[in-house]
Amino acid sequence: MLLIPAIDLKDGHCVRLKQGDMDQSTTFGEDPAAMARKWVDAGARRLHLVDLNGAFAGAPKNHAAIKAILKEVGDDLPVQLGGGIRDLDTIEKYIDGGLRYVIIGTAAVKNPGFLKDACSAFGGHIIVGLDAKDGKVATDGWSKLTGHEVVDLAKRFEDWGVESIVYTDIGRDGMLSGINIEATVKLAQALTIPVIASGGLAGMADIEQLCAVESEGVEGVICGRAIYSGDLDFAAAQARADELNGAA
């Protein structure tokens, strides 16, 4: 089970939002590269970056912070990034710059042709981020709820060659209310590609529940507010996950 620390970038700083609201942000650090190093030193085996300004603007914004993170830890572990990725040129620049995975969210839903092209051009590097509430997909920084069913869309994307799905329950994100295990497992069972859980991780009990369903196709979990607020000790949680799943 991969525990993946999230570094959410707003105006060059590390922040956490409450339920995706840019007006409800808490700053946890002003040096994103140092934050990345902290999580790597604590045992992280992948990092999850979000360009929040990019997600809302529809174009990459936190260039300097992302570059600094990749320079600091890019050789140590895979880094994945979402937020504002809307064209192939952006993907190419990120991958050439050392990013392992790009996460396409809104654009995958609104412009499926772009996602298809991205999978063709950058096979093995494309993750889709599906944000949902009550099983329905949301777009545009969670501000718009669509009529699309999560499972139906994910199956289509799987057919196109997407590497994995990051599934976020937006009713829980940043609320420390617990991962929506049932919905995450339902999605994972419908797919052959891995699912990464996100949204609401509250503590060690969530980690233990996720480890119990790893065999269903839940590969990892994004660790956000809980590891910044102190509700979850990241190093201890990754060690516990490894113990439960028999990893070295």
UniProtKB/Swiss-Prot annotation:
PANTHER family: 1-(5-PHOSPHORIBOSYL)-5-[(5-PHOSPHORIBOSYLAMINO)METHYLIDENEAMINO] IMIDAZOLE-4-CARBOXAMIDE ISOMERASE. Gene3D superfamilies: Aldolase class I (3.20.20.70). Pathway: Amino-acid biosynthesis; L-histidine biosynthesis; L-histidine from 5-phospho-alpha-D-ribose 1-diphosphate: step 4/9. GO terms for cellular component: cytoplasm. GO terms for molecular function: 1-(5-phosphoribosyl)-5-[(5-phosphoribosylamino)methylideneamino]imidazole-4-carboxamide isomerase activity. It comes from Paracidovorax citrulli (strain AAC00-1). SUPFAM superfamilies: Ribulose-phoshate binding barrel. It catalyses: 1-(5-phospho-beta-D-ribosyl)-5-[(5-phospho-beta-D-ribosylamino)methylideneamino]imidazole-4-carboxamide = 5-[(5-phospho-1-deoxy-D-ribulos-1-ylimino)methylamino]-1-(5-phospho-beta-D-ribosyl)imidazole-4-carboxamide. It comes from the Bacteria. One of its GO terms (biological process) is L-tryptophan biosynthetic process. The lineage of its organism: Bacteria, Pseudomonadati, Pseudomonadota, Betaproteobacteria, Burkholderiales. Keywords: Amino-acid biosynthesis, Cytoplasm, Histidine biosynthesis, Isomerase. CDD domains: HisA. Its EC number is 5.3.1.16. The active site is at residues 8, 131. Pfam families: His_biosynth. Belongs to the HisA/HisF family. It is found in: Cytoplasm. This is 1-(5-phosphoribosyl)-5-[(5-phosphoribosylamino)methylideneamino] imidazole-4-carboxamide isomerase. It is an enzyme of class 5 (isomerase).
